[in-house]
Amino acid sequence: MDEQIFLMGGNPPIKNHTIVNKIVSSSMIERIVIFTIFRDNWQPYMKKYTEVFQSHFPNLNTDYLLLDTEQIDFDSYLDADVIIIGGGNTEKYIATYVNQNFKNYIKHMLNKGAKVIGFSAGALLLGEKVYVSPNDNSDHQIKIKNGLGLFSQFLISVHYDSWNDKANKDRAEELVNVPIIPLNDHSCLVLDKLGNIIEKID
C-alpha cells in the first residue's frame, strides 16, 4: 500500500528531509488545501505549512480553509494533491472537523490518491479515538474523544518530548484497549489509506 497519511508529532515546518521526500517523491503536487481554524494572525503562519513544498513545486496552488468560520463546498477541492490539517487548539479542531461531511471528503480524497498530512491537533483527530493530553486542554485532564476514524488499531500522542508526556500517555493507555504511539515534535507516523502503519520516522 502507498504512503498516504502522515501524522506529524509537532508544528510546521517539516524539518526532516526523509519525511519531505516521502511526500513529494511519488507525485506531482499542484494543489494543496490547508484546513485550519481562525486565530489572530493565522495567515502569516500558513506559509510554514507550505514553504517546504513551494521549493519543490514553484507553481503550487494553495487554499486555506477555515471550517469554523465559513461554509465549505468540498466539491470545489476535489483536485487537491495534498490535504493538510493544521495544529492548534485540539478541542476546537475536534469540534470543527470531526463530522461526517469532512470524513467523507477525506476518505474520498484518499481513495483518489491524495496525501493527507496532520500536524499535532490535525494528526490527533484523524484517529477513531483521540487522546487529548492534560497539557493540551484548560481542564488539565486526560480526555479521550471521538475522531474521524482513519486509523483505529492505535491512538497517538503528540509533542511527546516537549510536553514530557510519558506519565500522562501511560495513564491514558489504561483507559483505551489499544496502544498509544508517542510522537515527538519532529516525528512522523506514516500510514496507508486504510490506516495501517508503514513506518515511523523520528
Language model: regions and residue ranges:
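Short, flexible loop segments at the rims of nucleotide/cofactor-binding pockets, characterized by
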Residues: G9-P13, N61-L65, Y93-T96, N135, ...
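Glycine-centered flexibility sites
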Residues: G9, G87-G88, G118, G122, ...
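Structural motif
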Residues: L7, V82-G86, I117-G118, L155-I156
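N-terminal beta1-alpha1 cap of cysteine-dependent amidohydrolase-like domains
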Residues: M1-V82
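Non-catalytic interaction surface on structured domains
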Residues: F35-R39, D63-S76, I85-A114
